[in-house]
């Protein structure tokens, strides 16, 4: 929160310029949702809650096509979980969700503040999920942002270059299990270029991880912080069917025998829309996650295959996601039915999964999608 104050000061510098401009455009929009779920466990568990995310944006465009805009939004939420009609947990609060200011033109943008940064070609099992935690099962695609300065430049041949600096982020993000040091900036970049039939990209990121408060200090040699470097490769092609691949190589210079220094993540996927009725969309991905002591060692692997499908039915849509773990021979099943009505969207979810979710690093051990159950959700967009 102390770093948020600095970004508030940054954005407040630009507010007088917005207010003094007659052609300034202001918008207030947002999203409100309520949900209730039942988990068929022993004993039976159920969950209910609500969320409100209002978003205020303000922007001004000059005759030179230079644009200055900002967005402020908060995530206010209330969640209760029960077992045998007795409360077993609750969570509520108001947290900053997005808080950024941006200067942009037709070919570049520079954005500073609390923002979402995500990229890559995969859709379900994403090795390049470095800064977000979007879950493909979540229809709202909510994810916390990161405090960052992000610059992007778009070339005439559709290539684009990214540079970023992150600072003040003391919680884990993406696939991380150890948070970054909030006092030491992280930095990286990405270059994406067009290739025959599609596009390809290379990404890099460097951070300093902080073990204090995460593991037993007796097993660590040195200060408890260590550098980590990431290299990412991805590509996507339209060859009649959609094909994509992602690869992430992570090296941690940690002086202890309790952690393996190399992490490798790989995804290969494809999708196609069949001309059946209103159009049946299907996609599949193969994913492998491994840790090793040396970069070319096979290490300890976790392997998953995923399949997703959706079919539109007028104002309704039926979809599903299926995962199979080749490591422990387990299935993850998720079916959703969606109905759209003006500003309202209604969802019905059915799930049948192992008692412990091992796919996504959400940081939440009490996952209501674990086991078997049903969930209802209503969403209002304004």
Where are these regions (language model features)?
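Signature for the C-terminal beta-barrel architecture of outer-membrane proteins
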Residues: 24-28, 63, 67, 107, ...
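Transmembrane beta-barrel architecture of outer-membrane proteins
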Residues: 31-33, 49-53, 93-98, 144-146, ...
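Transmembrane beta-strands of outer-membrane beta-barrel pores
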Residues: 34-40, 58, 62, 72-80, ...
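Surface-exposed strand-loop-strand hairpins of Gram-negative outer-membrane beta-barrel proteins
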Residues: 35-51
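Outer-membrane beta-barrel architecture
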Residues: 53-57, 99-102, 150-152, 190-192, ...
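Outer membrane beta-barrel
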Residues: 59-161, 166, 193, 355-357
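C-terminal structural cap/anchor segments
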Residues: 278-334, 338
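Outer-membrane beta-barrel "beta-signal"
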Residues: 307, 368-382
């Amino acid at each position: 929160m102390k770093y948020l104050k600095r970004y508030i000061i940054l954005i407040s510098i630009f507010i007088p310029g917005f207010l003094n401009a007659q052609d300034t455009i202001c918008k207030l929009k947002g999203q409100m949702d309520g949900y209730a779920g039942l988990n068929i466990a022993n004993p039976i568990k159920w969950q209910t809650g609500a969320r409100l995310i209002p978003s205020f944006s303000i922007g001004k465009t000059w005759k030179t096509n230079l644009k200055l805009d900002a967005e402020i939004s908060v995530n206010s939420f209330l969640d209760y979980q029960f077992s045998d009609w007795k409360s077993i947990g609750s969570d509520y609060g108001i947290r900053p969700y997005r808080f950024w200011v941006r200067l942009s033109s037709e070919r570049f943008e520079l954005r500073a503040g609390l923002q979402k940064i995500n990229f890559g070609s995969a859709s379900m099992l994403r090795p390049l999920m470095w800064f977000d935690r979007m879950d493909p099962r979540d229809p709202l695609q909510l994810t916390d942002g990161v405090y960052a300065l992000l610059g992007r430049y778009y070339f005439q041949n559709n290539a684009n270059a990214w540079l970023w600096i992150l600072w003040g982020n003391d919680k884990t993000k993406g696939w991380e299990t150890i948070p970054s040091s909030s006092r030491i900036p992280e930095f990286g970049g990405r270059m994406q270029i067009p290739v025959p039939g599609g596009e390809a990209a290379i990404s890099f990121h460097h951070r300093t991880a902080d073990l204090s408060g995460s593991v037993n200090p007796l097993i660590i040699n040195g200060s408890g912080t260590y550098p980590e470097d990431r290299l990412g490769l991805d590509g996507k092609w339209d060859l009649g069917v959609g094909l994509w691949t992602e690869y992430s190589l992570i090296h941690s210079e940690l002086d202890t025998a309790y952690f393996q220094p190399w992490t490798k993540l790989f995804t290969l996927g494809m999708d196609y829309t069949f001309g059946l009725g209103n159009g049946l969309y299907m996609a599949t991905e193969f994913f492998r996650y491994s840790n090793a002591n040396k970069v070319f060692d096979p290490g300890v692997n976790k392997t998953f295959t995923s399949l997703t499908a959706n079919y539109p039915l007028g104002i309704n849509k039926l979809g599903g996601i299926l995962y199979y773990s080749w490591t422990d021979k387990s299935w993850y099943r998720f079916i959703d039915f969606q109905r759209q009505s003006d500003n309202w969207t209604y969802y019905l979810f059915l799930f049948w999964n192992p008692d412990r979710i091992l796919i996504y690093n959400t940081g939440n051990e009490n996952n209501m999608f674990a086991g078997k159950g049903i969930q209802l959700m209503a969403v209002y967009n304004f």
